Amino acid sequence: IGVNAKEIIDEAHEAQAWNLELIGRTLRLMSTQMTTDLFGDMPRSEAYESNSPHYDTQESIYEWMNQEIEELIGMYEDPTYTEAATNIPIDQSIDRVFAGDLNKWKHYTYALKARLLLRKLPNWENNAATCQAIITAVNRALEGWEDVLYRFDGGNGAQNSPWGEAFGSTEQGGLGWEGRGNMLNSAVPTKYFMENILGVFESHNNLKGWAEDPRILAFMSARPGPSGTSDSGTEMRYLDTNIGMDVSYKVDNYPTLFPEVDGKKVSVYTQNTGYVPLFLEEELLLIKAEATYWSGDKPTARSLTMQAAEINFDRFNLSSIYGSSYT
């Protein structure tokens, strides 16, 4: 992302194509935060200048990101940049996320600001001013919010979602050195994911379903066990991490991660026409809930958390999966 963004930003700046520069810098900021949150210190100020660039401290990188986000927001709010005659036409073929709509990119940038500021809680600058700044950024983002999604049309090769069934069985996924298959056709859910995250029950419950988390049916479908054994029934099986399956079992005895209900694919992520989410409304609401909690308003924090959960349930179409039994 960084190399491509640098080329876009440099060439756009030279041509005064401010709309393209804004999009490129926003993506660079997103990528920088994701990378430093994972790895800590990293090259930034000297990135791409040599084979052994200086490693900037994570603290200095956050200082740069906080400055960059304010400059970006200022440019998004300034018609001198957003309506410049030198801006280039940007459509869906260039911008797969918002088709060049800078208003939508602006609200995404406010969301990134909220994500940046959240890092100050609870141990860095946990005070009323920080909490209010986060809440304000979230509110500005929500004023014109649209989920930030990279959508796939389906078809051949890279036209399919990287988590789609097209890449489920092969290591390379048909993309050669450019990509890898997701191997979900041979993946088995872990004990931690099933028990600690989803709260799976020992067996299906006619009233409660398969797990505490009703999204389980949007993630996977149960499959029968080995025929001729005492465990031939249809169950949500799983394995402990790094523990192999018994010799009588095959991958087909464990849940499929390309779930179906009444013969219809239901996962929003593992379909070939799925999407990669860059920022969702649920995250915005949870960020606001966190800030509201630390500001002392726990009832509102709880309400926001519940609202985020409901939106996520709607995202996974639970009402259509469960039908009349879903409440």
PLM-predicted stretches and their roles:
Residues 314-327:
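CBM-like carbohydrate-recognition segments
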